[in-house]
Amino acid sequence: MKGLHKVIVQNNRLHYEFDIRRNITIIQGNSATGKTTLINMLRQAENLGADSGVDVNCDVPCRVLEGRNWKVILESISKSIIFIDEENVFINTEEFASAVQNSDNYYVLITRENLYDLPYSVEEIYGLHSSGKYQNTRKVYQQMYRIYSDKNILPIKPEKIIVEDSNSGYDFFRSVSEDQNLECESAHGKTKLFDLLQKVDTRQVCVIADGAAIGAEMNRLSAPAAMISRWRSWRTSTPAKSATGRSSAAT
């Protein structure tokens, strides 16, 4: 299954509308933002049909996958958008990751966990928010927003480049870095980026990585940066010379 699919899920109180672009989409966010409600509405529509009071509009079937028999159920589903809530612990397993990569379905995973076995794009990590649409009615209009923007201006002038790749990509950025008198180092894989960042001194660092597969690493790479910087500032007792932050750039 390929291409973009628009999904609309609504009843007399709630209206969800969003586009699914890739085979793996992640929805994150705090409690009470409407994530579980979306799953419940889809489940009601699937089990009760028109009697549920829920309308699901999409050009492909939308299904909810859950429970201990998930693998057996998944084998019978094809060319559908499958929604899975975070209470289903199987989404963290290698077995599930293998099943996802060998199927023709799209998957919408509602979880705050980092799913390291799945290669999902940083551009397909979303949150949910209520928009101003329908604000004069009783219906709440829910839309998705990207957590990590695809347009960023680096707030620093990097003194060191760390590249996820160790092959031609690294060779390119090493050549560019040499021209700019910058140090360039390969992490030899996305899973080693975080550990390498922790070993860097107070220099400003720019990370170059493949945005199409680094989604699971983004929480670790972005959130701790300021904390690491503050800790180094305290350790050296030279706040004015410490880094003000570390930026991660996805290409």
Regions found by a protein language model. Give the residues of each.
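Conserved P-loop NTPase "ATPase switch" module shared by AAA+ and STAND
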Residues: 67-94
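Post-Walker A alpha-helix
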Residues: 38-40
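Post-Walker A helix-loop "phosphate-sensing" segment adjacent to the P-loop in P-loop NTPases
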Residues: 44-55
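Conserved glycine(s) of the Walker
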Residues: 33-35
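Hydrophobic anchor at the beta1->P-loop junction of P-loop NTPases
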Residues: 27
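N-terminal pre-Walker A segment at the start of P-loop NTPase domains
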Residues: 1-16, 136-139
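Acidic, divalent-metal-binding catalytic cores of TOPRIM
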Residues: 88-89, 122-251
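Structural recognition of the conserved hydrophobic beta-strand(s) that form the central parallel beta-sheet
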Residues: 83-85, 104-114
